[in-house]
Amino acid sequence: MNLEALEEVKGFMPYHEGEALSKWAEEFSNKGPIMEIGTYCGKSSLFLSYGANKNNQLVFTVDHHNGSEEHQIDEEYFDNEIYDTETNSVNSFPLFVKNINRFRASNVVPIVRSSVDAAKTWNAYLGMVFIDGGHALETVSYTHLRAHETS
């Protein structure tokens, strides 16, 4: 995978942050798999995948793929490309899968659930947790608490 090519992937992560994230994933994936909370279209997942792959490690991505508050219709970051007209809702999962397949990131394992639901059943040790999910205070606080409890 060519990291520079990830600039083309839809997402909000600047290249320099993605490059740093990839280095952290490489460093901490020698202790266990990586978990990403909040996936959107997979840009950060791909940076994590690149780093974790150097240690033959998995990246678990947790996202309901219905978008955060700011991705909803009439909001600042609404995007028609991820809007499903059949269900009248945001659905970033098809574009996420397309991006993961395009870059052949076979070490990425999607968990299509809310972080709250996933946290209730997760009990495996992780080398690193990257949290960039919902930005509402309630979501951030709960997700951080559960990530800390299970690490």
Q: What is each model feature region?
A:
Residues 143-150:
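Conserved small/polar residues in nucleotide/adenosyl-binding loops
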